[in-house]
């Protein structure tokens, strides 16, 4: 009986210590030089958006100055930002990807 009480106490403590990870928005920012087709390609490659979703997000970026590509835990968001920015530079585009806390 004593052991059961200890196990329940440990389970409660572990559950109370587990917190969901902080989530971050990955954002693409508008610029006057990156072609719309390239933005759509980025959204399809790095965020697995279909053509319609990618087009909708691209138009949001174009009209509102930025658009959310997805919401991820920090490590994944940071990796996507780095990958997108490297891909844009490799293709000679100034497209800027950033993240902010959700």
Swiss-Prot record:
It comes from the Bacteria. Pfam families: ClpS. Coiled coil: none annotated. One of its GO terms (biological process) is proteolysis. HAMAP family: ClpS (MF_00302). Belongs to the ClpS family. Involved in the modulation of the specificity of the ClpAP-mediated ATP-dependent protein degradation. This is ATP-dependent Clp protease adapter protein ClpS. It comes from Shewanella sp. (strain ANA-3).
